[in-house]
C-alpha cells in the first residue's frame, strides 16, 4: 500500500513517540492482528508490555494508527479514565472469557467511556496531521464502536472481524457524525439494529 507524505510523517512521529516512551511500535503488514485469547482485531495499545500494534494491510490502517496512538497519549498523560480502565478492562475481558464479575455494567461503562475519549483524541490527531480521512464517516464508525460496548453488555461476546460495528454499513449509517449521542444505555432503536445485524 502506497503511503502519502503526510502518512509517512505521521508514522515517523508515532515511532518517535513510542521510542521516547519505551513502547515497542509494531506496524504489521496484515489485515488483522491476534490478541490474547485468539481474538482478531485491527490493533491495540498495551501499557504492560508496552506495545502499540496495528495491522497495516487494510484500507483504514491510518485511522487505526491514529486510534491506537490516541490510547498511548491517554497512558502517557495518565488521564483519569485511563486510570479507571486499568482495572475495568481486565474485568471486561475476564467476563467475556466466562468468569463472573460483580459490577460488570460499571466496568463496561468505563471501557466505553475510555473509547469515547480516545475516539475524540483520534479525530484531533487526524486533523493535526492533515491525514486523508473522511472525518464525518470516521466519527460515525467511532460512534458504532463506542455503542458496541453497550451491546456487548447484552451479548457477552466480542464482535466477529467480518461484521465488526465499524464495518457494518447499516449500523454505521444509524450513527451521528458528531460525538453527541446518548452513550448510556443503548437505545431500543440501536439495540434492534445490533440484533438484526447480528453484531
Where are these regions (language model features)?
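Alpha-helix boundary/N-cap detector
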Residues: 2-5, 9, 113, 137
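Active-site scaffold of zinc-dependent metalloenzymes
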Residues: 4-7, 12-61, 69-76, 82
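Post-HEXXH active-site segment of zinc metalloproteases
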Residues: 75-115, 139
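Pan-zinc metallopeptidase signature
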Residues: 88-96, 101-102, 125-199
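An active-site-proximal "capping" alpha-helix that borders the catalytic cofactor pocket
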Residues: 111-128
Amino acid at each position: 500500500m502506497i503511503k502519502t507524505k503526510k502518512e509517512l510523517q505521521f508514522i515517523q512521529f508515532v515511532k518517535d513517540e513510542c521510542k521516547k516512551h519505551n513502547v515497542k511500535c509494531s506496524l504489521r503488514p496484515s489485515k488483522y492482528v491476534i490478541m490474547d485469547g485468539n481474538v482478531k482485531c485491527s490493533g491495540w495499545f498495551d501499557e504492560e508490555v508496552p506495545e502499540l500494534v496495528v495491522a497495516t494491510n487494510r484500507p483504514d490502517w491510518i485511522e487505526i494508527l491514529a486510534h491506537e496512538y490516541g490510547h498511548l497519549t491517554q497512558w502517557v498523560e495518565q488521564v483519569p479514565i485511563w486510570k479507571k480502565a486499568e482495572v475495568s478492562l481486565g474485568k471486561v475481558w475476564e467476563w467475556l472469557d466466562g468468569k463472573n464479575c460483580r459490577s460488570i455494567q460499571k466496568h463496561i461503562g468505563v471501557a466505553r467511556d475510555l473509547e469515547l475519549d480516545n475516539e475524540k483524541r483520534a479525530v484531533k490527531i487526524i486533523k493535526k496531521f492533515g491525514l486523508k480521512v473522511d472525518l464525518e464517516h470516521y466519527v460515525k464508525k467511532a460512534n458504532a464502536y463506542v455503542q458496541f460496548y453497550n451491546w456487548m453488555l447484552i451479548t457477552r461476546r466480542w464482535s466477529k472481524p467480518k461484521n465488526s460495528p465499524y464495518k457494518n454499513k447499516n449500523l454505521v449509517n444509524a450513527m451521528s457524525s458528531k460525538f453527541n449521542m446518548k452513550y448510556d444505555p443503548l437505545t431500543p432503536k440501536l439495540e434492534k439494529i445490533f440484533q438484526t445485524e447480528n453484531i
